[in-house]
């Protein structure tokens, strides 16, 4: 097995997410988070010869798998980069409107389970945490130079960590003596400063999650891509997003809610709401979570939430 394929990945909500796209044989679709291609391969199985699938990923290992797939299937186009470049990338490929876009947010199992990537406190490895290891600042580099206030804001806001102040003070004290450059060093600092343990959760979980989200600009990218997708969806096109973190899901939920209803009209308005054009999005079904069987087979699916919206003929507000 190659390095790109040696870590098992179970795609979460596989059929549900692809079913939500209502794939047309001749449609153009985007998988904004290729990973190891679970969703992409199922989409391809439902596309005809005239269909196209554009896949995005930051991770060089994921891109290696995607490019191998593209060599054997000419319907596939590959973008090495974050999905925040959605419209620019589609423009570069000569693609206008699309029939659907799927995003499976957060970190993949191969990234967690490859100790050398520095995402997990289960391994002693260089503290990297970059999804794209070819660019940007590693977690260790950021921890070395970040202000105490920045460290606190990231760990408190992105990790929702109650003991962020204590953790940050310990980080600042330790880095003055020696670099915090491995996952074990950071995990030990956190463990010594988290007074209350959550059942079934390592004390370092929230801090590692927070730093990873910050290093990879995960929340900013979600917020940036959603309006781009809305602009590029054809009428009837679908947006499907799987979120694993409450902050990600909140961004998706609020966006879809905002653009699936009208702004309240003032009492003096001369027009009735019924006379207004449709909002640009329509919510499709309820938020969907994995069933007990899927969670039993893949415990990492437990926190997943799938939300789906459909583009209407309504104009996008300026």
Curated annotation (Swiss-Prot):
InterPro entries on file: RsmH (IPR002903), SAM-dep_MeTrfase_MraW_recog (IPR023397), SAM-dependent_MTases_sf (IPR029063)
Gene behind the chain: rsmH
Similarity comment text for this entry: Belongs to the methyltransferase superfamily. RsmH family.
Keywords: Cytoplasm, Methyltransferase, rRNA processing, S-adenosyl-L-methionine, Transferase
Keyword Lipoprotein among record annotations: no
UniProt subcellular location: Cytoplasm
Catalytic activity, reaction form: cytidine(1402) in 16S rRNA + S-adenosyl-L-methionine = N(4)-methylcytidine(1402) in 16S rRNA + S-adenosyl-L-homocysteine + H(+)
UniProt-listed NCBIfam families: 16S rRNA (cytosine(1402)-N(4))-methyltransferase RsmH (TIGR00006)
Species annotation: Neisseria gonorrhoeae (strain ATCC 700825 / FA 1090)
One of the GO biological process terms: rRNA base methylation
Descriptive protein name: Ribosomal RNA small subunit methyltransferase H
GO molecular function: rRNA (cytosine-N4-)-methyltransferase activity
EC identifiers of the protein: 2.1.1.199
Keyword Methyltransferase found: yes
Binding positions (S-adenosyl-L-methionine): 37-39, 57, 83, 104, 111
Function: Specifically methylates the N4 position of cytidine in position 1402 (C1402) of 16S rRNA.
């Amino acid at each position: 097995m190659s390095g790109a394929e040696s870590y098992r990945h179970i795609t979460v909500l596989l059929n549900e997410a692809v079913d939500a796209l209502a794939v047309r044989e001749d449609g153009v679709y985007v998988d904004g988070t290729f990973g190891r291609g679970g969703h992409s391969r199922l989409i391809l199985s439902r596309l005809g010869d005239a269909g196209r699938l554009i896949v995005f990923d930051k991770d060089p290992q994921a891109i290696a798998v995607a490019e191998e797939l593209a060599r054997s299937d000419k319907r596939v186009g590959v973008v090495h980069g974050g999905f925040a470049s959605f419209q620019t990338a589609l423009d570069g490929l000569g693609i206008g409107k699309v029939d659907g876009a799927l995003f499976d947010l957060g970190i993949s199992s191969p990234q967690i389970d490859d100790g050398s990537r520095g995402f997990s406190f289960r391994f002693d490895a260089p503290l990297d945490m970059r999804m794209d290891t070819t660019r940007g600042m590693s977690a260790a580099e950021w921890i070395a130079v970040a202000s105490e206030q920045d460290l606190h804001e990231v760990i408190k806001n992105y990790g929702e960590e109650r003991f962020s102040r204590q953790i940050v003070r310990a980080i600042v004290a330790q880095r003055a003596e020696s670099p915090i450059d491995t996952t074990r060093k950071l995990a030990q600092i956190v463990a010594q400063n988290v007074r209350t343990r959550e059942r079934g959760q390592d004390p370092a979980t929230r801090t590692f999650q927070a730093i990873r989200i910050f290093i990879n600009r995960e929340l900013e990218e979600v917020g940036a891509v959603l309006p781009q997708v809305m602009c590029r969806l054809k009428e009837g096109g679908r947006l499907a997003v799987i979120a694993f973190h409450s902050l990600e899901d909140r961004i998706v939920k609020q966006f879809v809610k905002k653009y699936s209803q009208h702004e309240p009209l003032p009492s003096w308005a001369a027009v009735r709401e019924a006379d207004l054009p449709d909002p640009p999005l329509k919510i499709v079904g309820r938020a969907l979570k994995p069933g007990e069987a899927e969670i039993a087979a893949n415990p990492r699916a437990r926190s997943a939430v799938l939300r789906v919206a459909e583009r209407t003929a309504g104009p996008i507000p300026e």
